[in-house]
Swiss-Prot record:
Transcription among keywords: no
Keyword NADP: no
Protein name: DNA mismatch repair protein MutS
GO cellular component term of the entry, any: cytosol
Pfam families: MutS_I (PF01624), MutS_II (PF05188), MutS_III (PF05192), MutS_IV (PF05190), MutS_V (PF00488)
Species per Swiss-Prot/TrEMBL record: Dechloromonas aromatica (strain RCB)
This protein's UniProt keywords: ATP-binding, DNA damage, DNA repair, DNA-binding, Nucleotide-binding
Recorded GO MF terms: ATP binding; ATP-dependent DNA damage sensor activity; damaged DNA binding; mismatched DNA binding
Family: Belongs to the DNA mismatch repair MutS family.
Record-level GO BP terms: mismatch repair
Superkingdom per UniProt: Bacteria
List of residues binding ATP: 620-627
Function comment: This protein is involved in the repair of mismatches in DNA. It is possible that it carries out the mismatch recognition step. This protein has a weak ATPase activity.
Amino acid sequence: MVKDKAPDLSKHTPMMRQYLALKANHPNTLLFYRMGDFYELFHEDAEKAARLLDITLTTRGQSAGVPIKMCGIPFHSLEPYLARLVKLGESAVICEQIGDPATSKGPVERAVARIVTPGTLTDAALIDDKQDLWLLAVTTHRNTAGIARLNLASGEFILIEVPTEQIPATLERIRPAEILYPESWTPNFGVDVARTRQPDWYFEFDSARRLLCDQFEVASLAGFGAEGLKPAIAAAGALLQYAQATQSGKLPHLRGLTVEIEGAYLGLDLATRRNLELTETLRGQPSPTLFSLLDNCVTSMGSRLLRHTLHHPLRARDIPAARHGAVEALLEDYGRLGNEVRKALRGIADIERIAGRVALRNARPRDLASLRESVARLEGLRAPLSDSPAPLIAQLFTELETPYPALELLVRAIAAEPGAQVRDGGVIAPGYDPDLDELRSLNDNCGAFLVDMEARERERSGIASLKVEYNKVHGFYIEVTHANVDKIPDDYRRRQTLKNAERYITPELKAFEDKALSAQERSLAREKLLYEAILDALLPVVPTLQTIARAIAQLDLLAGFAESALKRNWCKPEFAAETQLSITGGRHPVVEGELTNQAETFIANDCLLAENRRLLLITGPNMGGKSTYMRQVALIALLAHIGCYVPADRCVLGPLDRIFTRIGASDDLASGRSTFMVEMTEAAAILHHATNQSLVLMDEIGRGTSTFDGMALAFAILRHLIEKNQSLTLFATHYFELTRLSHEYSELANVHLGAVEHNDRIVFMHAVEEGPANQSYGIQVAALAGIPTAVVRAARKQLREFEQRAAVDPLQPDLFAQGAPEPAEPEPHPVVEQLAAIDPDSLTPREALDALYALKGLLR
């Protein structure tokens, strides 16, 4: 956290001096200052919080001659307000009273108890249980970006280095909750998340490396494979320093770094993730998406792994193939294995996040009770897995071994139904600690003592209505109505006067009060001490709990895949060494799911792409299903690469490195880009980066400009994809002239989506057939959309005129006719090419001089 210069406190009241001293350490963060039963905010913080949280802003008194603006919330309502702030991208500092008001001279001592930021949340009430929460830091060195990300709840700490132009795509894949970056930057991240500037020295490599080595208790980072990753280590150091500051100390559950290799995942750029609607629809809704369809997971850990897996399909096939084998094993004996696993998973709590809170020492009593019940279920979860032939399931069986010492501790120490907070008591189980049991016994005997004393005092005083009672404000007292005050014994001392009664205390009752209240206070203090000792005892078990949590998530994911495959009749995909994407009876998983809900049937289609058939040119009417067909092919490929069965009768896939999509039309007003500019930008990315192992989907290229321009661009892009990229491509178009290219390129095949016209009406068949379409049915689709009949009639008349005129004198030349050859574009001079590749801002003086000599050498 960045600190401001300390303010002049001499003219302020003692309480405001204390507040301002704390606030000076957190100038850019809302500070919640505990005062009795409320958290108060002052001055600018109060104005901001009142606006964001819709609470009353008031002014009370003055300090240093300035009116004190303030607002507040009850202490027991803090969490909902924090949740609202975090959703708005705000951070908060929680300042608690740590001194005793009864013994304090001046303001009660206060200290920062925790700092809540969008990327460092661990409280279950503040975070989505089905989504990982990543804190991310990024910095650059020359043309390389170092990115570090931390999941504080699970302890995952991951590094990656990518070219700087890939920062937006990487952030879109990770979807962090908060991004840290050097304050000297003007970032353009391309994602809308909370951003936190940090001093540039936070990202200094040497200090970052030392900090990381201290955290992991190692001499170097070579053991993690990270020693040479300077930008990533710099980012990781800034990240760790920030996390330690927010958690007020060390993070014992962070035990190492994972280096993510660029290219380990099937490449999905921003446009592809959006167009395939993996976890969010094009309209920003959570369903219907691939995630909402597949999320059969029983545990929140499984749901989070599913979301992560959808955005991280693996390029290598070993892990997906192992998952296919595990799903197959679950399906072969689903009643005994798959179904039993899902039953056993029910009731298992979020062990991953509870373990994180144990490590951070902010686990609540009910967290430990949930952990106890979940660990006790592990043997029942393991039992069905014991004889599975699938290697992955056998591995999970080993990882799910019950940590019995931890379980025994939780059973002995934590009450069956503990209180919500340690401060409320009732957390430690009876019989765990003799001293606590004795203190509780004193406290529990209060009721019997009061009943006995009430009977004795009634007999002694002759007052039948006399009561001996207790409340938290006035303690123990004897209550006598005004009509009977003349009968009270001499040793009664008045404690409080009410409208209809007087309350008294006696020496005997006072002595008991001191003893009872002391026992209660000591009992709560003892429980707090014991609870902290239990957290200490559980700390060494945290790595084991993290392993168990990962195994449960993996098993839940696999069981969910098996459930989807069984319910929807999906097949096990096959991986092949040669170039191909062969799908028989493929369906779009999400569209089929929606149609099934409406008791309708999805029309299955085949797709064959191979070495000698690399491009399918798709024609057909609007609404005929071209975009759905293209997306289903991409989704089937992606599902295979995450280890899931696929919606098809059969599927064989060769090697893939990336999936590109150019589908749909939308402008980007925020960046000032028109629909056509967005289309061309996405097409440019494909042409620059697609390889012969990429799957490319391109829909309606060139429609955002004039007919001639659009057709010329579509032709040139199509030719480039065939000749240069040589990708496996699905290319949908309304330019029927492009279909003639099948005579020029043997690897291009024409297919179309069929339709039938009857009495000026159109019926879409949604079936993919070989060969080109013969017309687009645009006017019929316009009629279906509700265009006025008169307009449709006029359009038909105009179309006939165009067709008659074209038969005599074609409106447009044949773009594919062989005309006079165009003059060849001059080849750029080598000096120009090399000069264009130089980034002067990234060169050292020595490197710039070397580059200049190299250019001069080329001129010779």
